[in-house]
Structure formats: structure tokens, C-alpha cells
Amino acid sequence: MEDNLPVNVREYQELAKKALPKMAYDYINGGAEDEHTLRENIAAYTRIILRPRVLVDVSKIDMSTTLLGYTMRSPIIVAPTGGHKLAHPEGEKATARAAASCNAIMVLSFSSSCKIEDVASSCNAIRFYQLYVYKNRNVSATLVRRAESCGFKALLLTVDTPMLGRREADIRNKMVFPRSGNLEGLMTTDDHDTTNGSQLERFARATLDPSLSWKDIEWLKSITSMPIFLKGIVTAEDARRAVEAGVAGVIVSNHGARQLDYAPATIAALEEVVRAVAGAVPVLVDGGIRRGTDVFKALALGARAVMVGRPVFFGLAARGEAGARHVIEMLNGELEVAMALCGCRSVGEITRSHVMTEGDRIRSLL
């Protein structure tokens, strides 16, 4: 056991900032434009107060939950973030092993720096795959087939990126993204010309399809048997349309605040989406989760599970596979403590009555 291990996500972030080149750190940590939503994703959690119940026998805590019939040790999923080789030479393979050792589902990014096949063969685990639909539909279709043939269990379609958000740190740094193993043989990411700013931004303009619409859900369903989640839902209107489209679940996400600045913080949008879905499909949430108490708050507001991206990346950058694993373990440990101190023996016992939101406090004064 190493001495002086980080004891929270913030300390891992500080280590990652020291370990990474400025361009890489700014890429993973940055947000869109003024970064208001980036800050708010985290700050919104601080405005939710816990309401603990006491004199409950919490000698045994069960954090397990299920999603699509798969049992998870806890409701914490590793979110899709691109370019893990920016953080560690083993990239997503190291992250996959870390997740598997914690019995956590990992979602592999479309922008993975490791091949789908290499990640799949790195360890035995339940994995999902995150997809963008590109102008060249054959690229997306090929990736779906590869993921399905490698045993991935679900598809997460990102729906909030008809074009890339304006990430000013990447523009300023003239961000150059590493070769993506996912896209090898399909299209190139080798153009390193940064004359006009971010190479990533230029690549996205050339490939992302701004014409993507609800009718494309049917196309995607026609080419795969994997259940489909829509990632990037923040309104009741879109949540209801997602259910009508027959998807398997929705993910309340603002793309880590990297797309539209001044979009709502995800935890602030969660309850609206949960109410609109009305139990028809599971609702997941990502963005801003830095503590086990944040996970608890999301579950209390109706999320089936949460997805955590940047913290795992920070762990990978700071200490490799061991760091990524430790971040997941820390969050699990914090969640267990929060459950015990709130009188919840299982995630099923976490209810809306265990939290007070800012809106609740305002309504109580009327």
C-alpha cells in the first residue's frame, strides 16, 4: 500500500493537473465558453441538503443495483470520456480493468484511443458503447457492429452534439487529439494542422452530422440488437419523445458542460426528466459528481445509476490503473457511509424524502 494516497477526488484532480501537459489537462477539465455550466454542475449538488433518518439498523449495507438485468456492485458507472492515452499509455484498457475490478460497468467512448477489440479483450466485464452518428453513416454502423461482435451490452447514443461546443481552452491551446483506435481504418485523425485553432474542433466540423433527428433512432435500431440509451437529455419534452421512440433508457447529461454553456446543471434537470419518464425506462445522470453524497442525492431524485467521467480520468492520470480503481472505490466507500448515516440499508431505501432541494426550501417559505 502506498503512503499518502489521495483521500478524495479533489486531491486526485490536483495530482492529475501536475502530471498532465497543460493541453491534455485543459482538454479533459475544460468546458464551453464561460464555463458557467461546468461550475454549476458541481455547485448545484452543494445546494441539495440531506435529510438523515436515525435509529435504523445499518449494520449491513447493500449498494447493489441492476440495469438492463445486469447486477452492479454499486450504482456507479464509468462514463465515456475520450482519449485515455492522454492520461496513461495503456489508455482505456487500464480504465476497463479498473472498472472490472470494482464490478462497475464501463462505457467505452467513440473517441477511445484504444481499439474496441483491445478493450474488450483486456478483461471480462459488462461494457456499454457510446456512439456519435457521423455524416458518413457507414462509419457509425461499422463501429456498432464491432462493439456488438465484441460483446458490448448496450449502446449510448450521444444526442447533444450536432456540432462541437465552443471550448475556448482547446482553441487557445490549439488542441491536437491523439489517434483514435476506434476510428482506425475508418477515417483519419492524423491531421495535426493547428493553424486555425483546435484540430479537434475542425475534425468535428467535418464529421459530426447536424441533420441528426428523431427519425435516425429508427435507423439505429434497425442495425443493432443492443438496447439504446439516449445521452444528452435535459428536458421533459425530450424525455417523453425518447420514451415514445422506444429507447431503453435516457441519460441526463450536458456533455460534461462541454457543449452548450448555460444549459442546466444535470442534477437540476434530473427530477424533471424522471417525472416525464414516469418509470417507463431507467434514468441515469452524469456531470458534477465528486462525492458519494452526490451519488446519494442523484439516487434520491430518481436516478437508477450515475456515470462518473472526469474523476476516473484524474485517477488514471495520477496513478494509472490503480488510481482509476481507487477513485471508484473511494466513491463507493463514500456512498456506503452516506447511506448508513442517512438510515438506508439498500439503494431501494433511498427516497425523495432523504433530500431537500433549493426548490423545496423556496416552496416551504411560500
UniProtKB/Swiss-Prot annotation:
Catalytic site: 255
InterPro entries registered for this protein in UniProt: Aldolase_TIM (IPR013785), Alpha-hydoxy_acid_DH_FMN (IPR012133), FMN-dep_DH (IPR000262), FMN_HAD (IPR037396), FMN_hydac_DH_AS (IPR008259)
Protein name as catalogued: Peroxisomal (S)-2-hydroxy-acid oxidase GLO4
Enzyme class of the recorded protein, top EC level: oxidoreductase
Binding-site positions, FMN: 80-82, 109, 130-132, 158, 231, 253, 286-290, 309-310
Catalyzed reactions: a (2S)-2-hydroxycarboxylate + O2 = a 2-oxocarboxylate + H2O2
Pathway: Lipid metabolism; fatty acid metabolism
Top-level taxon: Eukaryota
Catalytic activity, EC: 1.1.3.15
Subcellular location: Peroxisome
GO terms under cellular component: peroxisome
Pfam families cross-referenced by the UniProt entry: FMN_dh
Family that this chain belongs to: Belongs to the FMN-dependent alpha-hydroxy acid dehydrogenase family.
Secretion signal span: none
